[in-house]
Amino acid sequence: LVIPGGAGETFMQTQDTATLNWIRKIDKTTKYTTSVCTGSWILGAAGLLKDKNATSNWYRADEVLKMYGAKFKEARWVSDGKYWTSAGVSAGIDMSLAIIDDLLGRKYTESVMLDLEYDPKPPYNAGVPSKTDPLVLDMMKEMYDMLMLPLIQGEQAKRKLK
């Protein structure tokens, strides 16, 4: 099972009982239950990451995953039993290759990497908050805050009332 992420719509899915129930049902049949980016928020909301190590997109990852009982790890991808989570979208590729390796071994994984010509060389070393120019990081946080913060704070308030 692969749960993709995104922005506002992803967080809205954390509130959708039908979606969460479907994920819980399918999870009982999977060898791997995975997420890419903020898809881990949905797995968390389904209760599948409680007391599990997990990661997510950098934006408020620690705060949101803790809200669902997960233990945030700052990493490209994290596996904890059958639960595999990746940080951003490009980290999902790395996680997918690690799953292929887990299933089929190094030679097969290398053949997939060759077929994809997967040899990333980004133009800047700035793909995580600790390596990003502080001005760029602040700008991105402000942009995401305008979209996401009201949703996150609303969920936190609901949880405090329970």
Segments from the language model and where they lie:
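Active-site-adjacent pocket-lining segments in enzyme domains
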Residues: 1-162
